[in-house]
Amino acid sequence: MSQPSNSGGGASKGIVKILILAMLAIGIIGLPVGLYEIGTLIATHMAVGDIENGYAYGGLMSIIYNATHISQYQQLSQILPATGVTMGTQDITTIQIFLLLLGLFLDAPLAYMTYNIYRHLEDE
């Protein structure tokens, strides 16, 4: 009696399928979330500079106002710190969203390739 030519290897093929599905799940979720977190780290570093500059320029305008008593400098001394905080917040949001979308766009080919590998294993 002859045995089928593809006998054996069923357990290892099952483990490979499970690993491919796990890689697919980690890739689909992990890549966008990881890039989002990297964006948060980078943007927070950038935002600190914006906030420091806003408060520094606000303090400078306050000193100039105290020396000249021109009301525009007083207004600038009050507005510039808030402007620095706003710019810092915009930095964080922009970079987070950009890297999240980049992760989602990079995710599609990764998921497609992984699915094709899984489907190829199913056909064997």
UniProtKB/Swiss-Prot annotation:
GO cellular component labels: host cell membrane; membrane
Topology versus the membrane: Multi-pass membrane protein
Primary location recorded for the protein, binned into one broad class: host cell
Keywords: Host membrane, Membrane, Transmembrane, Transmembrane helix
DNA-binding is among the record's keywords: no
Highest taxon above the source species: Viruses
Compartments where located: Host membrane
Residues passing through the membrane, by range: 15-35, 92-112
Entry protein name: Putative transmembrane protein 57
Provenance organism: Sulfolobus islandicus filamentous virus (isolate Iceland/Hveragerdi)
Organism taxonomic ancestry: Viruses, Adnaviria, Zilligvirae, Taleaviricota, Tokiviricetes
Gene assigned in the entry: SIFV0057
